[in-house]
């Protein structure tokens, strides 16, 4: 009798295990494979350094934000080693244009290191503080609107990419140093950009004032006569919102604004996801360049997965889209680890190819993986 009961118990365990494995396989995610792909991407990118202006520029800033997020999720010291190595060789410096949001993006990684390495004197955030103070409080021609008003460069963050580059840094710095004034200043300038570039009907951001319709014949349009909304540009914004919310206090007085904006944009991005999982470079005219693009799609995947993992987005509605997107992103990675199908540096929709890559594309890939890994937890 005991033997029969033992056999029945063993059979139940085996059947249960088999069903669990089957369900896990149906979900289409394998943690070990995701982690391996992320490490391969890191190793390839570290062996093939690239930047637009300098090792402290925005392209490296975006890449090392991805490395930071990968470390935060996995705690794999390969990521931290890469972070510390670049910070050491950069001497903890930002790039040089104090009025330009792009040039402080690299500081996200410095602050992240400081939050995880408490050795006295190891991390130097003084260059970051000097940049942020000058960026927020010193006069410049963009704030004054002089000489650039014809181009719409009349506010500090006049292009939507800026909402990824500077606000998460200011927010993280406020958290790390316990100085909420930096978050309050961030909100002030964020609202300027929101009011100037956010299209409430489309629930998307124009990249800059060139693409904001004014009701004239000069309005820029896609071949299908629709507005031009750039995938990576909106990826910068939505990915940046997830970064902001992740480190923003739950009782922050303006948090509801950011949560609502995040959910509004997320719902629109979900509506625009193509069947193969990857968003096209032109969101409202996907046929213009009818192939997936990794940088925008990577930021969307990160943001949507973060929203699911943190209870802001409905799991049943968004998780299938996230998994489909991750599978498509993974298929864009070459055998050696290089992540292809990344649109080159630009400011509007352009094509990509299997062989086009950029460090910020790798960063987007790592960010996506860092949140997709959490879906099964």
From Swiss-Prot:
Top-rank taxon? Bacteria
Q: Name one Pfam family in it.
A: Glyco_hydro_88
- What Enzyme Commission number(s) does the record list for this chain? 3.2.1.-
Its main subcellular localisation, reduced to a broad class, is periplasm
The alphabetized list of GO BP terms reads: carbohydrate metabolic process
- Active-site positions on this chain: 161 (proton donor)
One cellular component term (GO) for this entry is:
periplasmic space
Q: What induces it?
A: By ulvan and rhamnose.
Compartments where located: Periplasm
Record key words, sorted = Hydrolase, Periplasm, Signal
Q: Enumerate the InterPro entries for this protein.
A: 6-hairpin_glycosidase_sf, 6hp_glycosidase-like_sf, Glyco_hydro_88, PolySaccharide_Degr_Enz
Q: Which GO terms describe its molecular function?
A: hydrolase activity
Q: Where is the signal peptide?
A: 1-25
Tell me the protein family, please: Belongs to the glycosyl hydrolase 105 family.
Relate the protein's function as given in its record: Unsaturated beta-glucuronyl hydrolase involved in ulvan degradation. Ulvan is the main polysaccharide component of the Ulvales (green seaweed) cell wall. It is composed of disaccharide building blocks comprising 3-sulfated rhamnose (Rha3S) linked to D-glucuronic acid (GlcA), L-iduronic acid (IduA), or D-xylose (Xyl).
**The name this protein goes by in its record:** Unsaturated 3S-rhamnoglycuronyl hydrolase
Q: Per the UniProt entry, what species is this protein from, by scientific name?
A: Formosa agariphila (strain DSM 15362 / KCTC 12365 / LMG 23005 / KMM 3901 / M-2Alg 35-1)
């Amino acid at each position: 009798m005991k033997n029969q009961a033992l056999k029945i118990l063993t059979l139940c365990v085996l059947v249960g295990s088999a069903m669990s494995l089957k369900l896990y396989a149906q979900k289409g995610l394998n943690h070990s494979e995701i982690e391996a792909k992320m490490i391969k991407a890191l190793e390839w990118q570290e062996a093939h350094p690239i930047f637009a202006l300098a090792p402290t520029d925005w392209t490296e800033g975006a890449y090392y934000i991805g490395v930071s997020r990968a470390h935060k999720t996995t705690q794999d010291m390969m990521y931290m080693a890469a972070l510390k190595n670049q910070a050491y060789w950069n001497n903890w410096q930002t790039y040089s244009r104090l009025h330009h949001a792009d040039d402080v993006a690299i500081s996200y990684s410095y602050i992240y290191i400081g939050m995880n390495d408490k050795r006295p004197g190891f991390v130097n955030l003084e260059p970051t503080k000097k940049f942020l103070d000058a960026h927020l409080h010193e006069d410049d021609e963009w704030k004054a609107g002089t000489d650039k008003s014809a181009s719409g460069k009349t506010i500090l963050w006049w292009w939507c990419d800026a909402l990824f580059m500077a606000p998460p840094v200011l927010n993280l710095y406020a958290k790390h140093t316990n100085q909420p004034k930096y978050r309050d200043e961030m909100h002030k300038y964020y609202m300027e950009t929101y009011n100037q570039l956010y299209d409430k009907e489309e629930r998307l951001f124009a990249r800059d004032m060139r693409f904001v319709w004014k009701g004239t014949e000069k309005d820029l349009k896609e071949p299908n006569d629709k507005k031009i909304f750039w995938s990576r540009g909106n990826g910068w914004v939505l990915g940046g919102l997830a970064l902001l919310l992740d480190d923003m206090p739950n009782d922050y007085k303006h948090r509801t604004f950011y949560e609502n904006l995040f959910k509004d944009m997320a719902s629109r991005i979900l509506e625009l996801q193509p069947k193969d999982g990857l968003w096209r470079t032109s969101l409202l005219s996907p046929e213009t360049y009818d192939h997936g693009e990794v940088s925008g799609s990577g930021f969307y995947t990160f943001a949507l997965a973060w929203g699911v993992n943190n209870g802001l987005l409905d799991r049943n509605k968004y998780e299938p889209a996230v998994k489909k997107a991750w599978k498509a992103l993974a298929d864009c990675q070459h055998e050696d680890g290089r992540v292809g199908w990344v649109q080159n540096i630009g400011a509007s929709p352009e094509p990509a190819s299997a062989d086009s890559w950029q460090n910020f594309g790798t960063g987007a890939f790592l960010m996506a993986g860092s949140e997709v890994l959490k879906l099964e937890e």
